[in-house]
Amino acid sequence: MSSSLRQWFARVLVLTQLINGALCWGKEGHYTVCKIAESYFEEETVAAVKKLLPKSADGDLASVCSWPDEIKHHWQWRWTSPLHYVDTPDYRCNYEYCRDCHDTHKNQDRCVTGAIFNYTMQLMSASENSDTIVHYNLTEALMFLSHFIGDIHQPLHVGFLGDEGGNTITVRWYRRKTNLHHVWDNMIIESALKTYYNKSLPLMIEALQANLTNDWSNDVPLWESCQLNQTACPNPYASESINLACKYAYRNATPGTTLGDDYFLSRLPIVEKRLAQGGIRLAATLNRIFSSKPKHAGS
């Protein structure tokens, strides 16, 4: 890894520590997904992830899971912006890879599902054949994959094309003017932390982990599974997200709407479950990648 990239990681980590609880959804949500995933890593995965992480991460994947958001506005990384989401036709409430996975210039496979397949393939090629390692930056591949599996579980990262996943829908979150996408990226989690967890992200993560071993325990094997022995299966995750976007995110959230307790209390369980699902599925994907068992990336 280059010295400049190491310096960037160090700077991001220091800022993360200084902010101390006032983090945006990108950091809070992605940290939560990756922290949950770490609890489900198999032994081979723990070793592989620690080997690939930058030294500044100190063996903690969660500490660098927001890196793709930190870099995407820098000119040399702008090409990654379309990889964080996939837009679908307005009001169809469904997702199709061949129809939807492209950037604004119609370059196919440039969307969040395509990115998950791509970075899965990169990590698999290295784990299966050491001769290919020189072709990919595996540290970046790990961080991109971990981040994008988080992104695809946010319903409005698989939203409508016409409103850019809710970014152009202006609403009020209680008294604060914002947009619908930001509500789901940030405001729901922020309000939950203040209302239920004394502004403590570790307490929220602990509560989600408790649900995974209790109320959701029967669902975990289903969340972990991929059809057809695939290593990565983001297409069903995208379909889930657009369905949830239509049923919960867009409903009763037209432009100019004030969203308050009714919206918050009915949508928070959706956000919490998507964070948990993202963590379980990230762990399952990385476990399949780094397992010695035969596998394939899928498509």
Swiss-Prot record:
Co-factor binding details: Binds 3 divalent metal cations.
GO biological process: DNA catabolic process
Catalytic activity: Endonucleolytic cleavage to 5'-phosphomononucleotide and 5'-phosphooligonucleotide end-products
Disulfide pairings: 34-65, 93-246, 101-111, 226-233
Keywords, comma-separated and alphabetical: Calcium, Disulfide bond, Endonuclease, Glycoprotein, Hydrolase, Manganese, Metal-binding, Nuclease, Signal
Cell wall biogenesis/degradation recorded as keyword: no
Cited InterPro entries: PLipase_C/P1_nuclease_dom_sf, S1/P1nuclease
Chain sites annotated for binding a divalent metal cation 3: 25, 30, 151
Sites where the protein binds substrate: 25-30, 69-75, 84-87, 94-99, 118, 136
Keyword hit for Coiled coil: no
Site keyed Important for catalytic activity: positions: 69, 72
Superkingdom to which the source organism belongs: Eukaryota
Annotated transmembrane regions: none
EC number assigned by the record: 3.1.30.1
Chain positions listed as propeptide in the UniProt record: 284-299
Binding site for a divalent metal cation 1: 69, 84, 147, 151
Binding site for a divalent metal cation 2: 157, 181, 185
EC class (word): hydrolase
Signal peptide: 1-24
Protein's job: Endonuclease that can use single-stranded RNA and DNA as substrates. In contradiction with PubMed:23620482, cannot hydrolyze single-stranded DNA and does not cleave mismatches.
Subunit and partners: Monomer.
Family: Belongs to the nuclease type I family.
Protein name: Endonuclease 4
Protein's organism: Arabidopsis thaliana (Mouse-ear cress)
